[in-house]
C-alpha cells in the first residue's frame, strides 16, 4: 500500500498546512467557525396576513397526507436520490473562535467589472494561451502558478494543495463542504491535461448534472473540446474532455480491465474525475463507483471529489492500495458560514445559544413548560394559589415560578404545547422576507405538499415590478419553445416569485425553474429532497420542514447526512456573507430534537458492493458461440476470458473488503494484546504468587495455620469436583439412550442451556430432530467428518473404571431447530431437559414428506456456516442461522414458560441421586472449612490477598469475553461480494448464458453482457424472444414499458382520472412472458439471488399511446399520473428501445422496429437537449 501524506486544513496543527498521520487513523478536524448573533428585524406587516393564516394549513399537514410518498427517480438510469455534499456542522458549531489567520481565515473573491460572459471568454483565452505555450515550449510550462493564473480570484489553500498533488502525478481524494469549490480542482486538472494534448473524463451520478457540467465546460474550453456521453446522448465523444455518467465509464472499463488499450475508449486518457464520489454509499448504485476504481488502469490519475464524510482517510487509503499513489486533501471550513434558525408560530430565532453548543434557551422544552406553567398558575383557582403560596413563603410572583416545577406538565400537555407552536407556511415565509433571508429552498418531503404550499402562499408578492416583467418575458419565451411543457397551474405563483420543484414536474419545466432561481427571479422554491442533489442551485436559506418523512405506512427519521445534504444548499459563495438553515417546529419534533441531529455529525462511507449479471458476464466471459463461424472451431470465436480466481481477486478489492481487512488487522492486534494481559494476570493469581504474598504479609505462625487450612480446602474442592463430574456423567448416561430412543415417531421439544460470551445463562427451547448418524450422506455429516473442530474425544470415567457395567463413554452430536429460527448442533452436555410434547411426525398433506424429513432437507440446503457458542470437554455447542423456510417451523416451538415440569421425561438414575447427595455433602464440608479459616488469626490480611486475586479473576473474565467477541467477529468476516458473485454465476450457468467452467459465453449471455438495466439477464431473455418480432413499434414500446415501470405509480388523490389501457396484443404478450419470468425467479430463488424481474402491464397503454402519436395534451387530459412520472417512464422506455439496435444476436426486424419506436417517442416535451 502507498502510505502518503494526508493534507488537512485545520486550525489545531502545529504545522500550518500539513499533517502526516497514518491513512488508517481518523483525521482530527478542527474547523473555524465564527458565530455571529443574527440581528432580528421587525418585518413589515403584510396587509393580507390574517387572510393567509386562515387559508394556510400548518406545515406538518403537508407531509402527513396518506399514500403521498415522494418518488425520488429523476432519470431512467439515474433514478435514486443524489447524495450531495454536506459539511461537518457539529464540529463547526462547537468551534466558535476563528483561530486561523492569513489566507485560511477568509475567501477572497475579486469580482471584475466585466459581465459574466466576458469573464468566461477571458478565461477561455487564458486556457488557449497556456495550450499555446505548451505547444511551443513543452509540458514543463505547466505549473501551479500557470494554472491558477486563469482565474480572476485567489484560490483556497485546499484547492492549491489538491492541484499540486495532481501535478505531482498522484491521484487525489478531496473531501470538502458544499459550494467550497471542488469543481475548480477538476477544471484545473482539465486545463493541464488538455494543454498536454491528452484527454480527461469527467463523471457524474446524474444525467442532469452531466448536462450542466457539459454546458459549463464548453463555456470554458470551447465547444470543440468538450463532449458528452449519457444513456441517450452522444455529442463529440472523441473530444479531449468528455462528460459522462458513471455507468457509461464502468461499461467502458469492462472491455479491458486494468489496461489503457488503444482498442478501448480510454485511449490517451490521463485523468478521470469522479464527482460526488460519496455516492459510493448509495445502496443501489454505489457498486458502480467501486468498480470504476477497481478496473481503472493504474496509469490514469483519479480525482475523487467528495462531500464531507467521516472516513475520507479510509477512502484515500483504499484507492492508494488498489490503484496507486493517492493523496488526501480535506477541508471542513465552509466558504459561506452557516447559521441555524428555528421557526415557530410566533418567532424565527437562532436554534443555538450564543456559544453555539446548546439549544437556545427560549426554544427549550423547559422554557415552553415554564410559560405554560405560568399561564396555568394565573388561571387556577384560589385553593391552588394558596397551596403554591404556602410552599413558596407566600410569594406568587413569576420569578419564583422560574425555580420550581412542583407540577410538571404531562406528556399530553407537552404535545399540546408543541402543536400550538407549529407555524403555518405563511408565518415562516413572513419572517424570512422580513429578515432578508430570501431566496430560499424549502424542503417538503412529498410532491403534493410542495404543490399545496405554492397555492397557500401564492398571494405573497415577492417580486418587484421589474422582476415580474422579466418572469413574464421568460415564461412567454418558454411557452413558444415548449408549449406542452408549461405547467399552467404554477403560473400564478411563478409571477409572484414562488415555485415547486419535484419529480412530478417535467424535466424541461424543472430546468426552467432552476434557471429563474439562479437569476434571482424565483424567491422561494418548495422542493423535495432531490433538489439537494448537486445541481447548481444555491440559495441564501434552506428551510427543512420536518426531521421525519413518510416511507410507506410508517415515518422514518432523517439521518445527519440527509440533513447536511439539504442544509448545504444554503449560502451562495461570492454573494452571501452567511447562509441560513431554518428548521421548523412540528407536532413530532421541537428544537431539542433538531439540536441532537445537528450535533450528530456526518456518517462514514459504507461499501454497498454487490455483484450483478452484467458484472459476472463481463468479467468471466471468454470464447463465445456464434451462429456463423469465421474459421476456427465450428461455432466458436476464441477470446481470452478471466478465470474465477482472477475475477475473485478483482471482486475482493472492494472498499468493504479493504475496511474489513483493517478491522481484521486491528482485531488480531487486540487479541494478541489481550492474550498477553491474560498471561500476566494469570501469573499474578497463581498458587506460587499468592503463596509468596502470604509469606510477605503474614507472621510465620499465621502463615503456617492458613497454609494447612488451604491444603485441606484444596483437597475438599478436589473431591467436590469429582462428585460434580460423577453427576455430569450419570446425567450423560441417562440422556444418551433417551435421545437415541426419540429418533422415531413424534419430534419432542427439548431445552438447551449454555452461557453466552458475556457469561449470561441462556435457555433455548427447540424441536429435536435426531442423532447426527441419522443424517446419513448429508452435507452436514460430510462437513463434520472433514472439519477437525467438530471432533469429539473419549471421556475416561476414572471414578467408575473399576465398577462392572460402567463402560467408557463418548459424547455424541445431535441436531435441533430452536424457537429463534437457528439450527443447533450439540452434545448431551447442553441438554437441560426433554419434554413429552412435540411436533407430530405426520405429513401435513397427502403426498407430503414427514416433518422430520422436511426439516432435515432444509438443513442440508443450508451453507453450513456454523458458529461455536460454547465448548467443554463433553463437546461443543454450535449454532447456524435458519432460513425463511425454517422460520414457519420455528414459530411452532413453544416458549419455556408454557411447558410444565410434569411434562419432562428426563428422569435420573439412583446413581445420579447418590452422586447429587454426596456433592451436596461435600459443599457443606467446604462451607464449614471456609468458616474455620475466616476465624483464624491471619485471615484478615489473607482475605485482602484473596480479594485482590478475585478482582484480577474478574478482569480476566472480561478480557476473555472480549476475546471471544473478537474471535466471533473475525470468523464472520468474509470477502464481500464474492458469495453473491458465485450465486449469480450459478444462475447464469443454469440459464445457458455462460458455461462457468469453460467460460464459453452463449448468445443469451452476449446480449445480457451488452445491455444496461437492473436485471440484465431478464431483459436479454425477453428481447431475444422471437414472439416480439411480430409486434408493431407502438406495441413493442408498450411491452418494453412493462419491463422498466418499477416505482412508477398513479396518484391516489386523482380518483376520477384514468390511464390508457394497453392493446390486447400487448396484454397477451406480457401474459406470455410471465411464464418465462416465473422460471427465472424460481432459478434465482434456488441460488438465493434476489434481483427483481420487472413485468407490469399497468402503464403499458400510456407508452403505447404516446408511441402511436397522441399529443402530450391528449395524454395528460384527466391523467391519473403526474407528468414527471409519465415523462420518466417514457424516457426509460426510449432508453431500452435505443439499446436494442446495438445489442448482439437480436433479430434485425426487432432492431428496426425498436429504432422506429424510439424515434417516434423522442419528441417534445420529453426530449432532452444536452447543450
Swiss-Prot record:
Residues 424-620 form the Helicase C-terminal domain. It catalyses: ATP + H2O = ADP + phosphate + H(+). Disruption phenotype: Embryogenesis arrested at cotyledon stage. Altered size exclusion limit of PD; abnormally maintained dilated PD at the torpedo stage, and increased formation of secondary branched PD. Chlorosis. Altered plastid development. One of its GO terms (cellular component) is chloroplast stroma. It holds the Pfam family DEAD. A motif (DEVH box) lies at residues 275-278. Residues 163-327 form the Helicase ATP-binding domain. One of its GO terms (molecular function) is RNA helicase activity. Residues 1-58 form a transit peptide. Its EC number is 3.6.4.13. RNA helicase involved in group II intron splicing. Essential protein required during embryogenesis. Involved in post-transcriptional gene silencing. Modulates the determination of cell fate. Necessary for normal plasmodesmata (PD) development and aperture regulation. This is DExH-box ATP-dependent RNA helicase DExH15 chloroplastic.
